[in-house]
Amino acid sequence: MTLLEVNNLGKHYNGDTKVLKNVNFEIGSGEFVSIIGPSGAGKSTLLRCINRMVEISEGSVFVDGQSVGDMKKKSLRTLRTNIGMIFQHYNLVPRLTVIENVLHGRFGYKTNLQGIFGRFTEKEKEKAFELLDRLGIADHAYKRCDQLSGGQQQRVGICRALIQDPKIILCDEPIASLDPNSSKIIMDYLKRITNELGITCLVNLHQVEVAKEYADRIIGLKSGEIVFDGPSNMLYQDKIESIYGFQQRELITV
């Protein structure tokens, strides 16, 4: 079943600067897909178009059969409960506790007043603790997030995404700020999310070898265009070199 459909997607700024050009692909339920490409290829912009954090200039994006670009504010807010986001720099509130940050993932289901006053149900709180336990950080539930390591903070970010009950999680360079051991822990958890919960994961990565190890499928972006889309075991060295060019020598492996 197709969960995400991107058709002739284009994004440009100031009229002329084209960041994405004629991007087309489909992703099914339960797939683990990685997007690779050099800095400036358009990877982050692509994820932000899917979630409509930035407006689409051309083409269309469908999530679970619904056109993201045509949605009004209320409908878009509802759709976003099905789209989890994980960010490179965690996007947590440092002064709040771990459990509070996780529960922020339920804001899409709340009225503005409920969100402001932190009115969460006992069931939601129980779910938050279950997720923290699943990711091995339940003991830190009442610590401030700025007291955690980077890897621990990213696990909080994963819990916050999961408590939304999403159908797809968009991960924007989730291990770029982490050491090798923490990176492996995060990637292992993301893979388990797909395998055990059936949640689709679309993961931007700069580390090609990590993408090949974890992803079922890889999409290669270069200058805003798709130049590779296929199984990870079909991404050969010549194609990697064509995607990254002179940057290929500087690629990070974990």
UniProtKB/Swiss-Prot annotation:
Binding, ATP: 37-44
Pfam families, sorted: ABC_tran (PF00005)
The reaction(s) this protein catalyses: phosphonate(out) + ATP + H2O = phosphonate(in) + ADP + phosphate + H(+)
Domain ABC transporter: 4-248
EC annotation from Swiss-Prot or TrEMBL: 7.3.2.2
Keywords: ATP-binding, Cell membrane, Membrane, Nucleotide-binding, Phosphonate transport, Translocase, Transport
Bilayer topology: Peripheral membrane protein
GO molecular function: ABC-type phosphonate transporter activity; ATP binding; ATP hydrolysis activity
Entry keyword Lipid biosynthesis: no
GO cellular component terms listed in the entry, alphabetical order: plasma membrane
InterPro entries in alphabetical order: AAA+_ATPase, ABC_transporter-like_ATP-bd, ABC_transporter-like_CS, ABC_transpr_PhnC, MetN_ABC_transporter-like, P-loop_NTPase
Protein family according to the UniProt entry: Belongs to the ABC transporter superfamily. Phosphonates importer (TC 3.A.1.9.1) family.
PANTHER family (UniProt xref): AMINO ACID IMPORT ATP-BINDING PROTEIN, PHOSPHONATES IMPORT ATP-BINDING PROTEIN PHNC
Protein name: Phosphonates import ATP-binding protein PhnC 2
Origin species: Oceanobacillus iheyensis (strain DSM 14371 / CIP 107618 / JCM 11309 / KCTC 3954 / HTE831)
Gene expressing this chain: phnC2
